[in-house]
């Protein structure tokens, strides 16, 4: 594949995973299938992560409290992505928490209204990520914390591809099913790319052990989430993809903060 093909796939992946505008010409003749496109998810996550990272850098430069700066950075990230992954986390929490059977869980997840489990999941997601990011700022440096955001964004988007490829669609008429199953080669490429991107950012900023802890946390979280969803829903949905991203992001930030 040419470098241009990877660049185009990355731009399309950014458009799929966020609200960042991309040139319409990139989608001429594109059928919307994501089988090969998922290989670019870590690169898209990296680019998406630079936006909240800049917000964090700006606020820390203005001597804002680390926790306030972290919360604002996460808010910026949610705006950039349209809260795509947070929505998936909330719907998955509502479905699994409120559904007594697979079928009931899927019906609840399809409901756009947020329930108690979803609200609690969102609150915990923002609170834990903000606390971990603030701890990283306090125990390392502002620049290191800034680099952590795109690194974790790349890792968590790579984890999506594992979850997606390893599980069949839970619903034949679901959004995730309509975009196609990721190619196994594309999934493997995404996992390797996610690890390398994380290494390039985390190792120089934090050292080897925090890098190892981050990789282990992302891998373990993605694996456990996939096994759990397989048992409860027997397949993935668009919501479980978002939930996987959020859980991996939470786990990785916590591991990074703890390893410092």
Swiss-Prot record:
Keyword annotations from UniProtKB, A to Z: Cell inner membrane, Cell membrane, Cobalamin biosynthesis, Magnesium, Membrane, Transferase, Transmembrane, Transmembrane helix
Q: Where in the cell is it found?
A: Cell inner membrane
Main subcellular localisation: membrane
Entry keyword annotation includes Magnesium: yes
Q: What cofactor is needed?
A: Mg(2+)
- Gene Ontology annotations of biological process type: cobalamin biosynthetic process
Residues crossing the lipid bilayer are 40-60, 64-84, 117-137, 142-162, 189-209, 210-230
Q: Name one GO molecular function term.
A: cobalamin 5'-phosphate synthase activity
What the entry lists under NCBIfam families is as follows:
cobS, PRK00235.1-2
Job description of the protein: Joins adenosylcobinamide-GDP and alpha-ribazole to generate adenosylcobalamin (Ado-cobalamin). Also synthesizes adenosylcobalamin 5'-phosphate from adenosylcobinamide-GDP and alpha-ribazole 5'-phosphate.
Similarity comment: Belongs to the CobS family.
HAMAP family named in the record: CobS (MF_00719)
| Protein name, UniProt field | Adenosylcobinamide-GDP ribazoletransferase
């Amino acid at each position: 594949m040419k470098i241009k093909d990877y660049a185009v796939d990355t731009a399309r992946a950014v458009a799929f995973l966020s609200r960042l505008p991309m040139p319409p010409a990139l989608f001429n003749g594109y059928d919307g299938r994501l089988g090969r496109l998922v290989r670019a998810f870590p690169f898209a996550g990296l680019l998406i992560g630079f936006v909240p990272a800049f917000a964090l850098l700006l606020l820390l430069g203005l001597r804002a409290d680390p926790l306030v700066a972290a919360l604002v950075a996460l808010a910026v990230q949610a705006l950039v992505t349209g809260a795509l992954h947070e929505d998936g986390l909330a719907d998955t929490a509502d479905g699994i928490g409120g559904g007594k059977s697979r079928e009931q869980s899927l019906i609840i997840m399809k409901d756009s209204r947020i329930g108690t489990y979803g609200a609690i999941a969102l609150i915990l997601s923002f609170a834990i990520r903000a606390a971990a990011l603030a701890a990283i700022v306090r125990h390392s440096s502002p620049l290191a914390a800034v680099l952590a955001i795109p690194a974790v964004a790349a890792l968590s988007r790579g984890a999506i591809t594992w979850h997606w490829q390893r599980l069949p669609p839970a619903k034949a008429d679901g959004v995730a099913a309509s975009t196609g199953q990721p190619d196994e080669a594309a999934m493997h490429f995404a996992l390797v790319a996610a690890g390398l991107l994380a290494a390039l950012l985390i190792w120089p900023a934090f050292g080897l052990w925090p890098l190892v802890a981050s990789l282990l946390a992302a891998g373990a979280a993605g694996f456990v989430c996939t096994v759990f969803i397989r048992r409860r829903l027997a397949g993935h949905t668009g919501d479980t993809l978002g939930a996987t991203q959020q859980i991996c992001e939470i786990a990785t930030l916590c591991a990074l903060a703890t390893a410092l």
